[in-house]
Amino acid sequence: MSGHNKWANIKHRKMAQDAKKSKIFTKLIREIIVAAREGGGNIETNPRLRAAVERARAENMPKENIERAIKRGTGELEGVDYQEVIYEGYAPGGVAVYIRALTDNKNRTAQELRHLFNKYGGSLAESGSVSWIFERKGVIEISRDKVKDLEELMMIAIDAGAEDIKDTEDPIQIITAPENLSEVKSKLEEAGYEVEAKVTFIPKNTVKVTGKDAEKVLEFLNALEDMDDVQEVYSNFEMDDKEMEEILSRLEG
């Protein structure tokens, strides 16, 4: 059985390989702008900015694009005033959906989201409706083929402050408290591991979906991810691995 994390990884790989890579850049630039505006333009003293810049570098964003986005955030260059807004709701099958958006027009974003929720048989809900289902956590991912000694990896991660390690899927996931993410990441990198790190929201419980509901959920999540204003989408669905792959193949085909 797999859930939101597997879907997100598949979606990210597809976007990185095709013409939608520009959407990744658009979202990352917005994140850099807002992070620099809120915490300053120094990545050494601004953890959120450092994380955004590291993700941009991992996607091979040109250095000048990153620097320009930082300057827009600090006010050195003129830029759009993006606001961070959280939206909550339910997808088909009672699946909880938690959306983080960066927008220059909250009314437009709310209207577009309401349209998508209605189109795919979900419902946009009030603030607090589903946020209690999710926990904010740091997540470090390592490709399984990069790990020669799983026990050694576990020992390093635990000693550095990791809370949990999920090694049943690829990539391997190391879960931390958000404030410990940088420390655990640094220790793993010092040990020679290539890692990707992010702060995310993990569901405390899941809802299994199958058949038409499963297809509608994945189609809906894809549509949400394709919105320029939407930065991150989190959900608590669970479905059979094979069924997910078959549905995604049809949707992307």
From Swiss-Prot:
Its main location: cytoplasm. GO terms for cellular component: cytosol. One of its GO terms (biological process) is regulation of DNA-templated transcription. Gene3D superfamilies: 1.10.10.200, 3.30.70.980. GO terms for molecular function: DNA binding. It is found in: Cytoplasm. Keywords: Cytoplasm, DNA-binding, Transcription, Transcription regulation. InterPro entries: Integrase-like_N (IPR017856), TACO1_YebC-like_2nd/3rd_dom (IPR048300), TACO1_YebC_N (IPR049083), Transcrip_reg_TACO1-like (IPR002876), Transcrip_reg_TACO1-like_dom3 (IPR026564), YebC-like (IPR029072). Belongs to the TACO1 family. PANTHER family: TRANSCRIPTIONAL REGULATORY PROTEIN YEBC-RELATED, TRANSLATIONAL ACTIVATOR OF CYTOCHROME C OXIDASE 1. This is Probable transcriptional regulatory protein TRQ2_0469.
